[in-house]
């Protein structure tokens, strides 16, 4: 019955025991602390709320929305979105921040609150500590509650932003007649990835576990031992590429035409080499646990490589500084 508080957010199991799990009480208290410590100082008084497809997600979302509205703030409910999508949506809608409800690669017994700032970035460690420290607050219940609206096009906005990049050659991809198999772990990636592939003109898509009902048919962490269904499908020889993601689609693993997983670190290096080949001299950054192959590839194309401490926010911080 753990409740884990870290720089990546507030994560817990679902026994509804206050202080020992991600209980309704704890969700309320952490939401109040987030509003008080982070959102209070922003000019915008609107936050986004999104979730992956876990069965507990809608209930937690309703609790958060109720708290935010009763504090006099506005909510834009994005519904089912990926974690990268909600970060992009913060910038588009110019909101004070966002709460993403997802325990990432953990199983259905878990859920979590991922807290974002007005830049669409995860909170800095010291900001998270403020939220954790100040969570004991009382609901104020303003006389005039905030406004609730819904926005259903966040995934489309994300896809269109990707397609607008000058290094994406949609026509070239469509001309290849590529066949792709996708394992979406029955969460939001099962919607987002096929939609993205279709936008690239890919017509043959095999959907495995792509019904976003929250029934995870295997361990959701995309490790080789957990993605055997996709690997077996690839070995049939009908597809050139396999894609599997975790429940909030912030982790991705590729599988080759032989059914062999192409490791996450190699995916980073391959993507970086493609971008660097079109933008010589550009810089890259990864955390200290990543392969040094990225450094070698960057220097090959005349760029500078920077490293950061482990944690997405640390990588982002170095990118902004350099």
Residue ranges and their predicted role:
Residues 3-4, 11-12, 174-199, 288-322:
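A structured phosphate/pyrophosphate-recognition subdomain
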Residues 36, 40, 46-110, 195-255:
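N-terminal small/polar loop signature for handling phosphorylated ligands or for N-terminal nucleophile
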Residues 48, 97, 179-181, 285:
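Conserved beta-strand elements of the Class I
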Residues 69, 78, 130-160, 164, ...:
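Proline/glycine-rich low-complexity loops and linkers
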């Amino acid at each position: 019955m753990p409740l884990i508080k870290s720089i990546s957010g507030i994560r817990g199991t679902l026994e509804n025991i206050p202080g020992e799990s991600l209980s309704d009480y704890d969700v309320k208290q952490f939401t109040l602390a987030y509003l008080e410590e982070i959102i209070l100082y922003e000019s915008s008084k609107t936050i986004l709320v999104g979730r992956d497809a876990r069965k507990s997600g809608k209930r937690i979302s309703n609790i958060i929305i109720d708290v935010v509205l009763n504090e006099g703030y506005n909510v834009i409910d994005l519904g089912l979105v990926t974690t990268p999508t909600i970060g992009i949506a913060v910038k588009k809608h110019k909101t004070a921040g966002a709460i993403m409800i997802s325990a990432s690669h953990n199983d259905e017994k878990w859920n979590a609150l991922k807290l974002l700032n007005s830049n669409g970035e995860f909170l800095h460690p010291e900001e998270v500590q403020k939220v954790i420290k100040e969570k004991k607050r009382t609901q104020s219940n303003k006389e005039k509650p905030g406004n609730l609206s819904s926005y259903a096009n966040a995934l489309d906005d994300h896809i269109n932003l990707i397609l607008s990049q000058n290094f994406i050659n949609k026509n070239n991809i469509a001309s290849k007649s590529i066949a792709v198999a996708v394992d979406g772990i029955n969460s939001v990636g099962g919607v987002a990835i096929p939609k993205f592939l279709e936008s690239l003109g890919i017509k043959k898509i095999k959907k495995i576990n792509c019904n976003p009902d929250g029934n995870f048919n295997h361990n959701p962490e995309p490790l080789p031992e957990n993605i055997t269904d996709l690997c077996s499908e690839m070995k049939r020889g009908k597809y050139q590429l396999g894609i599997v993601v975790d429940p909030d689609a912030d982790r991705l693993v590729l599988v080759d035409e032989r059914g062999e997983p192409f490791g996450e670190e190699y995916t980073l290096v391959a993507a970086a080499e493609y971008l660097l080949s079109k933008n010589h001299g550009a810089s890259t950054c990864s955390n200290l646990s990543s392969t040094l192959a990225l450094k070698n590839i960057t220097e090959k194309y005349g760029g500078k490589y920077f490293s950061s401490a482990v944690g997405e926010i640390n990588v982002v911080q170095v990118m902004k500084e350099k």
